[in-house]
Protein backbone atom coordinates (compact mmCIF):
# COMPACT_ATOMS: atom_id res chain seq x y z
CA UNK A 1 0.00 0.00 0.00
CA UNK A 2 0.96 3.66 -0.24
CA UNK A 3 0.59 4.02 3.55
CA UNK A 4 2.63 1.95 6.01
CA UNK A 5 0.87 -1.18 7.31
CA UNK A 6 -1.77 -1.01 4.56
CA UNK A 7 -0.34 -3.90 2.56
CA UNK A 8 -2.84 -6.44 1.24
CA UNK A 9 -2.19 -10.05 0.23
CA UNK A 10 -4.85 -11.74 -1.89
CA UNK A 11 -5.07 -15.29 -3.22
CA UNK A 12 -7.64 -16.12 -5.94
CA UNK A 13 -8.11 -19.88 -6.59
CA UNK A 14 -10.57 -21.14 -9.22
CA UNK A 15 -11.54 -24.60 -10.53
CA UNK A 16 -13.94 -25.28 -13.42
CA UNK A 17 -15.17 -28.72 -14.47
CA UNK A 18 -17.51 -29.52 -17.39
CA UNK A 19 -18.66 -33.04 -18.27
CA UNK A 20 -21.03 -34.22 -21.01
CA UNK A 21 -22.65 -37.65 -21.18
CA UNK A 22 -25.41 -39.65 -22.86
CA UNK A 23 -24.55 -38.25 -26.29
CA UNK A 24 -24.73 -34.69 -24.96
CA UNK A 25 -28.21 -35.16 -23.49
CA UNK A 26 -26.81 -34.30 -20.05
CA UNK A 27 -24.28 -31.61 -19.23
CA UNK A 28 -22.75 -31.27 -15.77
CA UNK A 29 -20.89 -28.17 -14.62
CA UNK A 30 -19.09 -27.39 -11.38
CA UNK A 31 -17.09 -24.40 -10.27
CA UNK A 32 -15.25 -23.53 -7.09
CA UNK A 33 -13.78 -20.07 -6.71
CA UNK A 34 -12.98 -17.63 -3.96
CA UNK A 35 -10.29 -15.56 -2.35
CA UNK A 36 -8.32 -15.15 0.83
CA UNK A 37 -7.44 -11.58 1.69
CA UNK A 38 -5.07 -10.63 4.50
CA UNK A 39 -4.49 -7.04 5.51
CA UNK A 40 -3.60 -4.98 8.55
CA UNK A 41 -5.14 -1.54 8.27
CA UNK A 42 -3.92 0.21 11.43
CA UNK A 43 -7.11 1.97 12.50
CA UNK A 44 -10.59 1.09 13.72
CA UNK A 45 -12.60 4.30 13.22
CA UNK A 46 -12.59 7.08 10.65
CA UNK A 47 -11.10 9.59 13.08
CA UNK A 48 -8.12 7.25 13.59
CA UNK A 49 -7.49 6.93 9.86
CA UNK A 50 -3.88 8.12 9.34
CA UNK A 51 -4.61 9.44 5.86
CA UNK A 52 -7.57 11.47 7.16
CA UNK A 53 -5.44 12.88 9.98
CA UNK A 54 -2.51 13.63 7.66
CA UNK A 55 -4.82 15.92 5.71
CA UNK A 56 -5.98 17.74 8.86
CA UNK A 57 -2.80 17.79 10.95
CA UNK A 58 -0.53 20.85 10.83
CA UNK A 59 2.43 19.79 8.64
CA UNK A 60 4.79 22.20 10.45
CA UNK A 61 4.53 20.26 13.74
CA UNK A 62 7.43 17.92 14.47
CA UNK A 63 6.57 14.21 14.60
CA UNK A 64 8.28 13.66 17.97
CA UNK A 65 9.29 15.74 20.96
CA UNK A 66 12.94 16.13 22.01
CA UNK A 67 12.54 13.36 24.61
CA UNK A 68 11.43 10.89 21.92
CA UNK A 69 7.73 10.89 22.77
CA UNK A 70 5.14 11.62 20.14
CA UNK A 71 4.34 15.28 19.58
CA UNK A 72 0.60 15.60 20.23
CA UNK A 73 0.54 19.38 20.73
CA UNK A 74 -1.77 19.82 17.76
CA UNK A 75 -4.02 16.89 18.63
CA UNK A 76 -7.70 16.82 19.50
CA UNK A 77 -10.22 13.95 19.71
CA UNK A 78 -10.74 14.23 15.94
CA UNK A 79 -7.23 15.36 14.89
CA UNK A 80 -4.33 13.09 15.80
CA UNK A 81 -0.65 12.73 14.94
CA UNK A 82 -0.83 10.50 11.82
CA UNK A 83 2.64 8.97 12.24
CA UNK A 84 1.90 8.07 15.85
CA UNK A 85 -1.31 6.40 14.74
CA UNK A 86 0.62 4.20 12.32
CA UNK A 87 3.32 3.21 14.77
CA UNK A 88 1.15 2.65 17.85
CA UNK A 89 -1.47 0.41 16.26
CA UNK A 90 -1.49 -3.16 15.04
CA UNK A 91 -4.09 -4.84 12.89
CA UNK A 92 -4.55 -8.39 11.61
CA UNK A 93 -7.52 -9.06 9.35
CA UNK A 94 -8.37 -12.12 7.29
CA UNK A 95 -11.33 -12.46 4.95
CA UNK A 96 -11.90 -15.87 3.34
CA UNK A 97 -14.57 -16.24 0.68
CA UNK A 98 -15.55 -19.38 -1.21
CA UNK A 99 -18.20 -19.82 -3.90
CA UNK A 100 -19.41 -23.27 -4.95
CA UNK A 101 -21.58 -23.62 -8.02
CA UNK A 102 -23.12 -26.68 -9.65
CA UNK A 103 -25.43 -27.01 -12.64
CA UNK A 104 -27.03 -29.91 -14.50
CA UNK A 105 -28.73 -29.45 -17.88
CA UNK A 106 -30.85 -32.22 -19.41
CA UNK A 107 -32.17 -32.13 -23.01
CA UNK A 108 -34.53 -35.13 -23.21
CA UNK A 109 -36.18 -33.94 -26.45
CA UNK A 110 -35.49 -31.24 -28.97
CA UNK A 111 -36.43 -27.81 -27.68
CA UNK A 112 -36.75 -28.84 -24.01
CA UNK A 113 -34.10 -27.90 -21.43
CA UNK A 114 -34.36 -28.94 -17.79
CA UNK A 115 -31.91 -27.14 -15.50
CA UNK A 116 -30.93 -27.67 -11.90
CA UNK A 117 -28.65 -25.08 -10.31
CA UNK A 118 -27.24 -24.83 -6.81
CA UNK A 119 -24.77 -22.33 -5.36
CA UNK A 120 -23.32 -21.69 -1.93
CA UNK A 121 -21.24 -18.70 -0.92
CA UNK A 122 -19.47 -18.63 2.43
CA UNK A 123 -17.58 -15.64 3.79
CA UNK A 124 -15.58 -15.85 7.02
CA UNK A 125 -14.02 -12.71 8.46
CA UNK A 126 -11.70 -12.40 11.44
CA UNK A 127 -10.30 -9.05 12.53
CA UNK A 128 -8.02 -8.02 15.38
CA UNK A 129 -6.93 -4.53 16.41
CA UNK A 130 -4.64 -3.14 19.11
CA UNK A 131 -3.72 0.34 20.34
CA UNK A 132 -0.62 0.51 22.53
CA UNK A 133 -0.40 2.29 25.85
CA UNK A 134 1.29 5.16 23.97
CA UNK A 135 -1.57 5.60 21.48
CA UNK A 136 -3.21 9.01 21.83
CA UNK A 137 -6.75 7.67 22.23
CA UNK A 138 -5.66 5.35 25.07
CA UNK A 139 -3.67 8.04 26.88
CA UNK A 140 -6.46 10.55 26.36
CA UNK A 141 -9.00 8.30 28.07
CA UNK A 142 -6.62 6.47 30.43
CA UNK A 143 -7.09 3.04 28.87
CA UNK A 144 -3.43 1.88 28.90
CA UNK A 145 -3.75 -0.27 25.79
CA UNK A 146 -6.92 -1.25 23.97
CA UNK A 147 -7.67 -4.47 22.04
CA UNK A 148 -10.65 -5.68 20.04
CA UNK A 149 -11.55 -8.71 17.99
CA UNK A 150 -14.46 -9.27 15.60
CA UNK A 151 -15.55 -12.27 13.59
CA UNK A 152 -18.41 -12.93 11.22
CA UNK A 153 -19.70 -15.73 9.02
CA UNK A 154 -22.08 -15.28 6.10
CA UNK A 155 -23.61 -18.20 4.21
CA UNK A 156 -25.91 -17.69 1.24
CA UNK A 157 -27.45 -20.77 -0.42
CA UNK A 158 -29.47 -20.66 -3.62
CA UNK A 159 -31.19 -23.35 -5.68
CA UNK A 160 -33.20 -23.04 -8.88
CA UNK A 161 -34.98 -25.68 -10.97
CA UNK A 162 -36.38 -24.70 -14.37
CA UNK A 163 -37.87 -26.34 -17.43
CA UNK A 164 -37.79 -24.35 -20.67
CA UNK A 165 -39.36 -25.26 -24.00
CA UNK A 166 -39.00 -23.45 -27.33
CA UNK A 167 -40.41 -24.33 -30.75
CA UNK A 168 -41.75 -22.82 -33.93
CA UNK A 169 -44.57 -23.81 -36.27
CA UNK A 170 -44.29 -21.97 -39.54
CA UNK A 171 -44.36 -18.29 -38.62
CA UNK A 172 -45.44 -19.02 -35.04
CA UNK A 173 -42.71 -18.96 -32.38
CA UNK A 174 -43.27 -19.89 -28.75
CA UNK A 175 -41.11 -20.41 -25.71
CA UNK A 176 -42.15 -21.04 -22.15
CA UNK A 177 -40.52 -21.54 -18.79
CA UNK A 178 -41.64 -22.84 -15.39
CA UNK A 179 -39.48 -22.98 -12.32
CA UNK A 180 -38.89 -23.03 -8.60
CA UNK A 181 -36.33 -20.98 -6.65
CA UNK A 182 -35.09 -21.16 -3.07
CA UNK A 183 -32.73 -18.89 -1.16
CA UNK A 184 -31.47 -19.28 2.41
CA UNK A 185 -29.36 -16.55 4.04
CA UNK A 186 -27.57 -16.76 7.41
CA UNK A 187 -25.26 -14.27 9.10
CA UNK A 188 -23.52 -14.43 12.49
CA UNK A 189 -21.35 -11.80 14.14
CA UNK A 190 -19.40 -11.56 17.40
CA UNK A 191 -17.12 -8.94 18.89
CA UNK A 192 -15.23 -8.25 22.09
CA UNK A 193 -12.96 -5.54 23.43
CA UNK A 194 -10.90 -4.94 26.54
CA UNK A 195 -8.36 -2.40 27.83
CA UNK A 196 -5.91 -1.66 30.66
CA UNK A 197 -3.35 -4.32 29.75
CA UNK A 198 -0.24 -5.00 31.88
CA UNK A 199 1.97 -5.13 28.76
CA UNK A 200 1.76 -4.12 25.11
CA UNK A 201 3.44 -7.40 24.18
CA UNK A 202 0.12 -9.24 24.43
CA UNK A 203 -1.49 -7.00 21.77
CA UNK A 204 -4.80 -8.71 20.90
CA UNK A 205 -3.62 -12.25 21.70
CA UNK A 206 -4.56 -12.38 25.39
CA UNK A 207 -7.80 -10.45 25.68
CA UNK A 208 -8.63 -11.70 29.18
CA UNK A 209 -5.72 -10.03 31.01
CA UNK A 210 -7.06 -6.49 30.56
CA UNK A 211 -8.32 -5.23 33.92
CA UNK A 212 -11.35 -3.55 32.34
CA UNK A 213 -12.87 -7.04 32.15
CA UNK A 214 -12.75 -7.56 35.92
CA UNK A 215 -14.24 -4.09 36.41
CA UNK A 216 -17.18 -4.90 34.14
CA UNK A 217 -16.11 -2.34 31.51
CA UNK A 218 -15.11 -4.72 28.70
CA UNK A 219 -17.62 -5.23 25.89
CA UNK A 220 -18.95 -8.38 24.28
CA UNK A 221 -21.52 -8.47 21.51
CA UNK A 222 -23.13 -11.03 19.24
CA UNK A 223 -25.81 -10.88 16.58
CA UNK A 224 -27.51 -13.17 14.10
CA UNK A 225 -29.61 -12.58 10.99
CA UNK A 226 -31.32 -15.15 8.79
CA UNK A 227 -34.01 -15.13 6.13
CA UNK A 228 -35.51 -17.40 3.49
CA UNK A 229 -37.12 -16.67 0.13
CA UNK A 230 -39.05 -19.25 -1.93
CA UNK A 231 -40.70 -18.72 -5.30
CA UNK A 232 -42.60 -20.43 -8.10
CA UNK A 233 -42.63 -18.76 -11.50
CA UNK A 234 -43.76 -19.20 -15.10
CA UNK A 235 -43.33 -17.28 -18.33
CA UNK A 236 -44.78 -17.63 -21.85
CA UNK A 237 -43.61 -15.75 -24.95
CA UNK A 238 -45.24 -15.82 -28.38
CA UNK A 239 -44.53 -13.99 -31.60
CA UNK A 240 -45.83 -14.27 -35.12
CA UNK A 241 -43.28 -13.72 -37.88
CA UNK A 242 -41.27 -11.50 -35.50
CA UNK A 243 -44.03 -8.97 -36.10
CA UNK A 244 -46.57 -9.42 -33.31
CA UNK A 245 -45.43 -10.19 -29.77
CA UNK A 246 -47.18 -11.34 -26.61
CA UNK A 247 -45.63 -12.17 -23.25
CA UNK A 248 -47.07 -13.15 -19.88
CA UNK A 249 -45.40 -14.12 -16.61
CA UNK A 250 -46.27 -14.75 -12.99
CA UNK A 251 -44.29 -15.19 -9.78
CA UNK A 252 -45.61 -16.54 -6.49
CA UNK A 253 -43.08 -15.77 -3.77
CA UNK A 254 -42.88 -16.20 -0.03
CA UNK A 255 -40.47 -14.49 2.34
CA UNK A 256 -39.79 -15.19 6.01
CA UNK A 257 -39.43 -11.43 6.60
CA UNK A 258 -43.19 -10.79 6.45
CA UNK A 259 -45.96 -11.42 8.96
CA UNK A 260 -47.47 -14.85 9.49
CA UNK A 261 -50.66 -13.87 7.62
CA UNK A 262 -49.02 -12.38 4.51
CA UNK A 263 -45.73 -14.12 3.75
CA UNK A 264 -46.73 -14.84 0.15
CA UNK A 265 -47.31 -12.48 -2.77
CA UNK A 266 -48.46 -12.93 -6.37
CA UNK A 267 -46.81 -10.83 -9.08
CA UNK A 268 -48.17 -11.06 -12.64
CA UNK A 269 -47.02 -9.20 -15.76
CA UNK A 270 -48.20 -8.99 -19.37
CA UNK A 271 -46.85 -7.17 -22.42
CA UNK A 272 -47.51 -6.86 -26.15
CA UNK A 273 -45.55 -5.51 -29.08
CA UNK A 274 -45.98 -4.71 -32.77
CA UNK A 275 -43.04 -4.23 -35.12
CA UNK A 276 -44.56 -1.98 -37.76
CA UNK A 277 -41.38 -2.10 -39.83
CA UNK A 278 -42.34 -5.66 -40.86
CA UNK A 279 -45.69 -4.58 -42.34
CA UNK A 280 -46.25 -4.31 -46.08
CA UNK A 281 -47.29 -0.67 -45.82
CA UNK A 282 -43.74 0.14 -44.61
CA UNK A 283 -41.97 -1.35 -47.64
CA UNK A 284 -41.44 2.03 -49.24
CA UNK A 285 -39.68 3.29 -46.08
CA UNK A 286 -36.70 1.00 -46.53
CA UNK A 287 -34.50 3.16 -44.29
CA UNK A 288 -36.61 2.04 -41.29
CA UNK A 289 -35.41 -1.39 -40.14
CA UNK A 290 -37.14 -1.35 -36.73
CA UNK A 291 -40.24 0.45 -35.48
CA UNK A 292 -41.68 -1.52 -32.59
CA UNK A 293 -44.60 -0.26 -30.53
CA UNK A 294 -44.97 -1.98 -27.16
CA UNK A 295 -47.03 -1.78 -24.00
CA UNK A 296 -46.83 -3.61 -20.71
CA UNK A 297 -48.27 -3.85 -17.23
CA UNK A 298 -46.81 -5.66 -14.26
CA UNK A 299 -46.62 -5.94 -10.50
CA UNK A 300 -43.41 -6.47 -8.55
CA UNK A 301 -42.78 -6.86 -4.84
CA UNK A 302 -40.22 -5.34 -2.48
CA UNK A 303 -38.73 -7.11 0.52
CA UNK A 304 -37.62 -5.10 3.61
CA UNK A 305 -33.97 -5.06 4.57
CA UNK A 306 -34.52 -6.29 8.14
CA UNK A 307 -35.49 -9.91 8.77
CA UNK A 308 -37.50 -9.41 11.95
CA UNK A 309 -39.74 -6.39 11.39
CA UNK A 310 -42.92 -8.48 11.74
CA UNK A 311 -41.87 -9.87 15.14
CA UNK A 312 -41.69 -8.42 18.63
CA UNK A 313 -38.16 -7.09 19.10
CA UNK A 314 -36.53 -6.92 22.54
CA UNK A 315 -33.83 -4.59 23.79
CA UNK A 316 -32.23 -3.50 27.05
CA UNK A 317 -33.53 -0.19 28.34
CA UNK A 318 -33.98 1.40 31.75
CA UNK A 319 -33.34 -0.03 35.20
CA UNK A 320 -35.54 -1.54 37.90
CA UNK A 321 -34.67 -1.95 41.59
CA UNK A 322 -35.02 -5.63 42.50
CA UNK A 323 -33.86 -7.46 45.63
CA UNK A 324 -31.45 -4.75 46.64
CA UNK A 325 -29.87 -4.03 43.27
CA UNK A 326 -30.57 -2.21 40.04
CA UNK A 327 -31.38 -4.58 37.17
CA UNK A 328 -31.19 -3.59 33.50
CA UNK A 329 -34.64 -4.23 32.03
CA UNK A 330 -35.43 -6.23 28.92
CA UNK A 331 -38.29 -4.52 27.12
CA UNK A 332 -40.05 -4.55 23.77
CA UNK A 333 -38.58 -2.16 21.19
CA UNK A 334 -41.09 -3.00 18.46
CA UNK A 335 -44.49 -4.68 18.21
CA UNK A 336 -45.27 -7.85 16.31
CA UNK A 337 -47.36 -7.37 13.16
CA UNK A 338 -48.66 -10.62 11.61
CA UNK A 339 -50.20 -8.53 8.79
CA UNK A 340 -46.93 -7.02 7.55
CA UNK A 341 -46.94 -7.73 3.82
CA UNK A 342 -45.13 -7.07 0.55
CA UNK A 343 -44.75 -3.59 -0.85
CA UNK A 344 -46.25 -3.78 -4.34
CA UNK A 345 -45.22 -1.69 -7.33
CA UNK A 346 -47.73 -1.54 -10.19
CA UNK A 347 -46.31 -0.17 -13.43
CA UNK A 348 -47.75 0.60 -16.87
CA UNK A 349 -45.30 1.24 -19.69
CA UNK A 350 -45.83 2.43 -23.26
CA UNK A 351 -42.80 2.52 -25.52
CA UNK A 352 -41.42 2.74 -29.02
CA UNK A 353 -38.17 1.17 -30.24
CA UNK A 354 -36.76 2.54 -33.48
CA UNK A 355 -33.88 1.80 -35.81
CA UNK A 356 -32.92 3.54 -39.05
CA UNK A 357 -30.35 2.76 -41.74
CA UNK A 358 -29.57 -0.73 -40.39
CA UNK A 359 -29.34 0.63 -36.85
CA UNK A 360 -26.85 3.35 -37.67
CA UNK A 361 -29.42 5.42 -35.75
CA UNK A 362 -31.46 3.64 -33.07
CA UNK A 363 -33.04 4.19 -29.67
CA UNK A 364 -36.25 4.13 -27.68
CA UNK A 365 -38.97 6.34 -26.20
CA UNK A 366 -40.80 5.25 -23.04
CA UNK A 367 -43.61 6.63 -20.92
CA UNK A 368 -44.38 5.04 -17.56
CA UNK A 369 -46.73 5.35 -14.61
CA UNK A 370 -45.56 3.59 -11.48
CA UNK A 371 -47.63 3.35 -8.29
CA UNK A 372 -46.14 1.81 -5.15
CA UNK A 373 -48.67 0.73 -2.52
CA UNK A 374 -48.45 -0.74 0.98
CA UNK A 375 -45.26 1.18 1.76
CA UNK A 376 -43.50 -0.17 4.85
CA UNK A 377 -43.11 2.44 7.59
CA UNK A 378 -42.67 2.69 11.36
CA UNK A 379 -45.82 4.09 13.01
CA UNK A 380 -46.45 5.39 16.50
CA UNK A 381 -49.10 3.47 18.45
CA UNK A 382 -50.65 3.71 21.90
CA UNK A 383 -49.27 1.83 24.92
CA UNK A 384 -51.39 -0.02 26.00
CA UNK A 385 -52.85 -1.96 24.18
CA UNK A 386 -49.48 -2.31 22.41
CA UNK A 387 -46.36 -3.29 24.37
CA UNK A 388 -44.18 -0.79 22.48
CA UNK A 389 -44.82 2.66 21.03
CA UNK A 390 -43.69 1.65 17.51
CA UNK A 391 -44.96 -0.85 14.94
CA UNK A 392 -43.82 -1.57 11.38
CA UNK A 393 -46.81 -1.64 9.01
CA UNK A 394 -48.02 -1.07 5.45
CA UNK A 395 -49.96 2.12 4.81
CA UNK A 396 -48.46 4.66 2.40
CA UNK A 397 -48.46 4.96 -1.38
CA UNK A 398 -46.38 6.88 -3.96
CA UNK A 399 -46.89 7.56 -7.66
CA UNK A 400 -44.11 8.22 -10.17
CA UNK A 401 -44.54 9.03 -13.84
CA UNK A 402 -42.13 10.11 -16.51
CA UNK A 403 -40.56 9.86 -19.93
CA UNK A 404 -37.26 8.26 -20.93
CA UNK A 405 -35.65 8.85 -24.33
CA UNK A 406 -32.47 7.36 -25.74
CA UNK A 407 -30.82 8.24 -29.06
CA UNK A 408 -27.81 6.30 -30.34
CA UNK A 409 -25.89 6.82 -33.56
CA UNK A 410 -22.94 5.31 -35.39
CA UNK A 411 -21.74 8.24 -37.56
CA UNK A 412 -18.64 6.41 -38.79
CA UNK A 413 -18.14 2.66 -39.14
CA UNK A 414 -15.20 1.23 -41.06
CA UNK A 415 -13.08 -1.89 -40.82
CA UNK A 416 -10.63 -0.24 -38.45
CA UNK A 417 -12.65 2.51 -36.78
CA UNK A 418 -16.10 2.92 -35.19
CA UNK A 419 -17.55 6.13 -33.75
CA UNK A 420 -20.53 5.73 -31.38
CA UNK A 421 -22.60 8.62 -30.01
CA UNK A 422 -25.25 8.36 -27.28
CA UNK A 423 -27.80 10.81 -25.94
CA UNK A 424 -30.19 10.11 -23.05
CA UNK A 425 -33.00 12.18 -21.58
CA UNK A 426 -35.38 11.39 -18.74
CA UNK A 427 -37.91 13.20 -16.59
CA UNK A 428 -39.77 11.98 -13.53
CA UNK A 429 -42.64 13.41 -11.52
CA UNK A 430 -43.30 11.96 -8.07
CA UNK A 431 -46.22 12.44 -5.71
CA UNK A 432 -46.82 11.09 -2.23
CA UNK A 433 -50.41 9.83 -2.27
CA UNK A 434 -50.75 8.79 1.38
CA UNK A 435 -48.85 8.13 4.59
CA UNK A 436 -51.66 6.63 6.64
CA UNK A 437 -54.68 4.35 6.56
CA UNK A 438 -57.64 3.68 8.85
CA UNK A 439 -55.48 1.79 11.35
CA UNK A 440 -52.10 3.52 11.28
CA UNK A 441 -51.82 7.30 11.17
CA UNK A 442 -48.66 9.31 10.46
CA UNK A 443 -50.35 12.63 9.65
CA UNK A 444 -49.97 14.48 6.36
CA UNK A 445 -46.22 14.98 6.55
CA UNK A 446 -42.99 13.62 8.01
CA UNK A 447 -39.91 15.77 8.64
CA UNK A 448 -36.47 14.39 7.86
CA UNK A 449 -33.58 15.13 10.22
CA UNK A 450 -29.85 15.49 9.62
CA UNK A 451 -27.78 15.94 12.81
CA UNK A 452 -31.05 16.69 14.71
CA UNK A 453 -31.97 19.54 12.34
CA UNK A 454 -34.98 19.44 10.01
CA UNK A 455 -33.77 19.47 6.40
CA UNK A 456 -36.49 17.65 4.40
CA UNK A 457 -40.25 17.23 4.46
CA UNK A 458 -42.30 14.36 3.06
CA UNK A 459 -45.86 15.65 2.59
CA UNK A 460 -49.00 14.09 1.14
CA UNK A 461 -49.79 15.56 -2.27
CA UNK A 462 -46.24 16.86 -2.75
CA UNK A 463 -43.21 15.42 -4.62
CA UNK A 464 -40.50 13.45 -2.88
CA UNK A 465 -37.16 15.09 -2.06
CA UNK A 466 -38.33 18.54 -0.91
CA UNK A 467 -35.81 20.58 1.09
CA UNK A 468 -37.59 22.18 4.03
CA UNK A 469 -36.14 25.09 5.96
CA UNK A 470 -35.91 28.85 6.32
CA UNK A 471 -35.64 30.85 3.10
CA UNK A 472 -32.73 33.28 3.32
CA UNK A 473 -33.31 36.62 1.59
CA UNK A 474 -30.21 38.56 2.66
CA UNK A 475 -28.36 40.00 5.64
CA UNK A 476 -29.02 43.03 7.84
CA UNK A 477 -26.67 45.91 8.61
CA UNK A 478 -25.12 43.89 11.47
CA UNK A 479 -24.37 40.89 9.27
CA UNK A 480 -27.25 38.80 10.62
CA UNK A 481 -29.35 36.57 8.39
CA UNK A 482 -32.72 37.73 7.11
CA UNK A 483 -35.41 35.18 6.23
CA UNK A 484 -38.82 35.19 4.63
CA UNK A 485 -41.49 34.47 7.24
CA UNK A 486 -44.60 32.34 6.76
CA UNK A 487 -46.70 35.39 5.75
CA UNK A 488 -44.10 36.60 3.23
CA UNK A 489 -42.59 39.41 5.31
CA UNK A 490 -38.87 39.69 6.02
CA UNK A 491 -37.63 39.10 9.56
CA UNK A 492 -34.38 38.47 11.37
CA UNK A 493 -33.27 34.87 11.69
CA UNK A 494 -32.99 35.45 15.43
CA UNK A 495 -36.80 35.82 15.48
CA UNK A 496 -37.45 32.80 13.23
CA UNK A 497 -40.18 30.36 14.25
CA UNK A 498 -40.63 26.73 13.25
CA UNK A 499 -43.75 27.80 11.34
CA UNK A 500 -41.59 30.04 9.10
CA UNK A 501 -40.02 27.00 7.45
CA UNK A 502 -41.10 26.27 3.88
CA UNK A 503 -40.13 24.23 0.84
CA UNK A 504 -36.94 25.81 -0.56
CA UNK A 505 -36.02 23.34 -3.29
CA UNK A 506 -35.96 19.71 -4.34
CA UNK A 507 -33.07 17.25 -4.31
CA UNK A 508 -34.31 15.07 -7.16
CA UNK A 509 -33.66 15.91 -10.81
CA UNK A 510 -36.72 16.53 -12.97
Residue positions per predicted region:
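Transmembrane beta-barrel architecture of outer membranes
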Residues: 8-14, 231, 265-267
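Transmembrane beta-strand segments that form the barrel wall of outer-membrane beta-barrel proteins
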Residues: 1, 246-255, 411
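Structured alpha-helical segments in the cores of large, soluble enzyme domains
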Residues: 230-240
Amino acid sequence: GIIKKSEVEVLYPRINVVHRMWDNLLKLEAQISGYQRSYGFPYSDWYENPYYNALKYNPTYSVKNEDGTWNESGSSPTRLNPVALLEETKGDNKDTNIKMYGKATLNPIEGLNINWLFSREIDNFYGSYYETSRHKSTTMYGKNGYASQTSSRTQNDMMEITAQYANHFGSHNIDGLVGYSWNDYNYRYSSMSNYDFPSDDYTFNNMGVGTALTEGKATVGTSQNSSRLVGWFARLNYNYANKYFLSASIRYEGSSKFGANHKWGTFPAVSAGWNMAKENFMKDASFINNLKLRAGYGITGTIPASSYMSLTRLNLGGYAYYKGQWINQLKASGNANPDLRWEKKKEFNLGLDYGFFNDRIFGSIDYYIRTTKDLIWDYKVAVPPYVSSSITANAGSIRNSGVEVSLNAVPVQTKDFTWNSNLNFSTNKSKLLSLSNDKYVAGNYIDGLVFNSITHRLEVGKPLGDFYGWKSVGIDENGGWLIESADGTVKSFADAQASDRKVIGNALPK
